Amino acid sequence: MSWHEVPGAEALGDDEAMGLVLKERPVALVRSGGAWHALHNVCTHQFALLSEGYIEDGCIECPLHQGRFELATGAPKAPPVTEPVPVYPVKSENGKVYVDLPD
Amino acid sequence: MTSPTERIVIVGAGQAGGRAAEALRGAGFPGEILLFGEERHEPYERPRLSKSVLLGEEPASAAALHPRAWYADKGIALRMRSRVEAIAPKSRSVITADGERVEYSKLLLCTGSRVRPLSGAPEGLAGVHYLRTFEDSERLAAGLEPGRRLVVIGGGFIGLEVASSARRRGLAVTVVERQGALLDRALPAEIAARVASLHAAHGAALRLGVPVARIHGNGAVKAVELADGAELPADLVVIGVGIIPNTELAETAGAVSADGLVVDEYCRTTLEDVYAAGDVTNHYNPILERRVRLESWQNAQNQAIAAARNIAGERRAYAEVPWFWSDQLGTNIQMVGVPDPAMQIVWRGERLAFGLLQDRVRLAVGFDMGGEIRAARRLIEARITVPAKRLADTAVRLKDLLTEATCSASTP
């Protein structure tokens, strides 16, 4: 595991997401209700970037077919998704945001 | 609620039937579930059949909702290649083509729809296709060879997705549509024109406003003749001129049907303990405040889930804004709401359009704009008035428009 800084994260507003690639891994960084969340950025149903989706009620909704994942756990919350997406720890220090990714 | 001896019979093992069975177990229904389907395949979704399967990216089997073993695990009895011929409402039973009588506690009809034949199209001409099923898709995919000439009859979503897949595989494509615009039933003409530009830019020829006169061929298709006398040489023809809901089974049993099987917002037909969901229904939508018949993935899935929950004893109305997507030529097109000829069209940038009636958002159409379409759905659901100028201003977040309107609405 290792922490990676996310440049530009502070520009995110509430219930907004950005997509990035860290260590060749697509990651969606989300700011919601004062908390940060990081999820694998690809929907488990069909290829789509979750960071282009809609955030509401603690969930992120896929832009392609409106499947929903819980931000905190990655758990599937609405069909057609049935498989969870991986989530990664996030920390905010001195105005900078870091994501912890498996090696 | 339900006792373990209860038995739900589902007729139709498509997307709706499969999702309903799944949702019944999800709602804790402990009794028997029997799922009858005419096809040999376990329930599958159709969207891929006109897209990734035709592109050769994946086999039609990728469209299955669940592997066959899943149904056994869930205690759902799959009765494939089994046609239900009749419903006997008084004895609460269905009769199969084999003459078997199966009793039900509650019956759910997910009989879907079938392709509308093109009148006058010759039977048995090689190279003429319709696209509805797993096998239709595999057959058509096998014929999409670079350099061949494809004529698509019908400029609706199926026709355009076939045209898209064929162009990407290097065929010469002509789309013929009798109406003056593509997607005539689904989109306002001004927005549909954007879709026409997309196809033209990718090299498809469009013939709008002219009906097909006849299809020529001798054993195999040779050409499509249009009403204006033009003759389009063709190696392949795909006909996509709509679908017809499969209402006959229920009608014969006495259920009321009017452009689809009539159900209320709890998915109940006019027959006692007989429910219906998916393409086959004509249902009351409380948000739109009118009846609709929908031919969509969303409706097949979510109305089926709603029906299952009501059957399992919940009382929950099915109320969603209609939403639909189509993937064409690398562009994801999504629409939410329903069109109306009287709509004012407002563009928000180049890729998102709204349809307004009396300053209320009733329709949104986006090109690679999934997240914004979702926000637009909220605006439609809220049934609030939004000034067109604010809507067109990309500096204003759609979410904020919703909050503003909600706040001003609650101010005395």
Positions of predicted regions on the chain:
Chain A
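Short cysteine clusters
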Residues: C43, C62-H65
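Short Gly/Pro-enriched turn/cap motifs at secondary-structure boundaries
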Residues: P79-V81
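Short helix-to-coil "ATP-lid" hinge immediately C-terminal to the conserved N-box Asn in the Bergerat
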Residues: R68
